[in-house]
Curated annotation (Swiss-Prot):
Miscellaneous remark of the record: Present with 768 molecules/cell in log phase SD medium.
Higher taxonomy: Eukaryota, Fungi, Dikarya, Ascomycota, Saccharomycotina
SUPFAM superfamilies, sorted: Acyl-CoA N-acyltransferases (Nat)
Top-level taxon in the UniProt lineage: Eukaryota
Species whose genome carries this gene: Saccharomyces cerevisiae (strain ATCC 204508 / S288c)
Gene3D superfamilies, sorted: 3.40.630.30
Protein name, UniProt field: Uncharacterized protein YGR111W
Amino acid sequence: MTASSNDDDLIFECYSDPELKRWTHLANAKAWKGILTVQQYADREQLLGSSEISQKNKSNEMMTKYPKSYQWLGQKYFVLKDRSLPDNGKFSQVVSSCETLNRIGYCIHPGSNGKIEPALIVCIGGVFTFENHRGKGYAKKMIIKLNEFYDKIRDDANTVLELKNLVINLYSEVGEYYSALGYESMHVPLHRISKLDELTERYCGEDDDHDGKYLGFDDYRGLVGLHETQFKESLLSLHKENPEKFVFTVAPDFDIFTWFQYRDLFIMNKSGRKAQQNLFFGYALSDNSHIIWHHNWNGDSLIIVKIHIPEETFQRKELKLKKLLRKAIEETKLHGLQELEFWDEEIPIKKYPQLFQLLTELENESKVFSENGSISAVRPPKGYTAEQVIWDNNTKFCWF
């Protein structure tokens, strides 16, 4: 029996069984384990699933702030079962699986009267069909049912704004596969820099910052709090320019950054690398301008997750950008990584002519604007087309 021949046999479930989670992660490890072993990958997924952002539905703060929706926050797990298959084991009828990481976001739209409203931002990940069940349309059926699952939550929201404003997005590693399922690509190119010494010498200049500080694992909550104002100002500005559009962003949250750090440290420790001394996760200047990064041990690169520079004159902003990039380059080299990487929406290089010109001189065009292996895609909210949606902060920051 195939998925397309009898949909009545297909059962879509949201589950919490830890044994099933482990089973699905052991099965899909081959696709995403990178330099880890299968067991290590499953261990990492268990660790990430128990992180603060993944367990947000258990947060007292969220329960108080969002009493009618907190249960939908955090990481959720789903499977598709085919009951026409032999029932000869606990998971023998499971054919596909996926997960979502649900976070609070903000939005502004024509019906919000110029006010920013909360939104539940649902990000799909881990879409996987088990090897012996491929080619039967199961993944497509699962995503259709996932769409329906979250549509019902939105449609039953009544006056709960964050549920009424629910948005689903994903990061596709299979090109435009999800376009047939209602997801519109919003690709953001990557910038991959390998000529680190040249960039330091010709763009960043001398290290004259003596009052800044490196960021450890959990000592920069106050800095992330600064993103709140910047994010909301950006939404209001985009709304003013595009009053007819639905503009949204994932909200800043310190727990998003620690999620990256858990990944970072786990892979470092399991990959056979020596324990890295003086491992930092970012740098802040004395005025609280700062950069937060992620050591991508799998890809031998340092990825800029977020950069925050208070709005000033362009000249002063670029001066601070140079200082922060210098610190990122130093971190890249210190730990033997080969490239510095960032998304164009994080640092739109064409807005910095000096940086853009230098990168085009130093690097091959395929690195200056590299195709992103994780294509951002969004399912437009009810009543909007893709052209009427703006995804702000569409960067590594909200990747899952």
